[in-house]
Curated annotation (Swiss-Prot):
Family that this chain belongs to: Belongs to the FAD-binding monooxygenase family.
Region (Disordered), start-end ranges: 499-519
Protein name per Swiss-Prot or TrEMBL: Baeyer-Villiger monooxygenase
Binding site for FAD: E41, T49, W50, R51, D52, D61, Y67, V110, M399
SUPFAM superfamilies: FAD/NAD(P)-binding domain
EC number: 1.14.13.-
Organism taxonomic ancestry: Bacteria, Bacillati, Actinomycetota, Actinomycetes, Kitasatosporales
Amino acid sequence: MAEHEQVHEHVRVAVIGSGFGGLGAAVRLRREGITDFVVLERAGSVGGTWRDNSYPGCACDVPSHLYSFSFAPNPEWPRTFSGQEHIRAYLEHVADTFGLRPHLRFDSEVKRMAWDTEQLRWEIETVRGTLTADVVVSATGPLSDPKVPDIPGLDTFPGKVFHSARWDHDYDLAGQRVAMIGTGASAIQIVPSIQPKVDRLTLFQRTPAWVMPRVDRAISGAERALHRALPATTKLRRGLLWGIRELQVQAFTKHPNELGFVEQIAKRNMGAAIKDPALRAKLTPDYRIGCKRILLSSTYYPALAKPNVDVVASGLSEVRGSTLVAADGTEAEADAIVFGTGFHVTDMPIAERVVGADGRTLAETWKGGMEALRGGTAAGFPNFMTVIGPNTGLGNSSMILMIESQLNYLADYLRQLNVLGGRTALDPRPAAVRNWNHRVQERMKRTVWNTGGCTSWYLDASGRNTTVWPGTTAEFRRETRRVDLAEYQVLRPAPAQVGAKAAEADTGADTGADAEVSA
């Protein structure tokens, strides 16, 4: 398809994004007998986060047999925690196995989409043209748009600058003085991967992280053969991994003080590698473990102990040419800056492009904080669902479990529309959205994410946790098993518009009636 070719089509469902959420939605649509759908992807291939993040050492911190679809088990995972290239290959395999290729529209970034209150459908403008859809599933994910802090003087830096999610593989770090900004999940994988080759590595750490050892190993050929021959063993392995994490949830959500034992394990992990008391003090968090995402690595601390690594216990505040200045005044020279500063999680950029029934964008609606009914649907945005929406994140388990629960909800949502018949839309009642989010926030009050004494990317600008689910994945699955129509307004075309259709066919008259709302 030529660039900017104009496409005008109407589909039953448009899915935005082709990571785990988007491909999972596509598989579920086909299983529901829906083939009239497209998957709009801004890049040139599938993979989402696992396509965009290809930095050295990139891997998942959830065991691979749990970080995969239940309907697409993979007996060939090479390691307990497989690397980015294997996860991306798995997603390509899913696209092929389930016949998703004909539905994929690559290089089709959504520029704007708006709800048509007369036609009861979404008009979607992409870089390749315009299409309309009865239902839109936004599966862009919270880790899709990198966040780079606005550092004074950064434009004066003469060297190389890039974000971990936009790694420049053409730039050779060997022999360079490199500054790593941030100490999150990406940084703890990058640091040990580049430390042996760089001349000097300076880590700017605003807040230290709790790091637990990562018990990773190669999965033997015999194990893989067993999983191929007896698929039930793969299911059993997955079930055990899931069950262990479900049991851990109580400590995060109801009894944070029980995490003290886990803190001692993390401190021993640090002490085994970091012998310098001053460096240990820099790396020891002053908040409860679990308040920020617990990181897994058995190589991070050993790398920080190497003689060519400096840890600055302060965030980067200014750049003066090739000199980087921390908030505490510490200075360091660098040839390259790598930002491991996370993503736009609580202010997802896609929200600025989605215009609802009242003419406001989703970003404007969420200005006071993200809210959605059961993590997926927002009031004023009919027939629109977000996969991995507000308060669907997890602090200790696999997001694929949450995605599959949301896909159950999506499937029932579409069934309800079919039962209602005709041109119909469902719009969450504001009271239902408020009630759901009140329940979530009340449960959040006791969790370690709210009481642990830290500021994390789970929190929005007002300090409210709009990211994490304060319960087990089994609880969320029960909450999203069925759509309760009492929580929705049913929208239909106004009678005048319906009655005018025959006349419109004969005269070409344009009807402009508003939609009728049913209880």
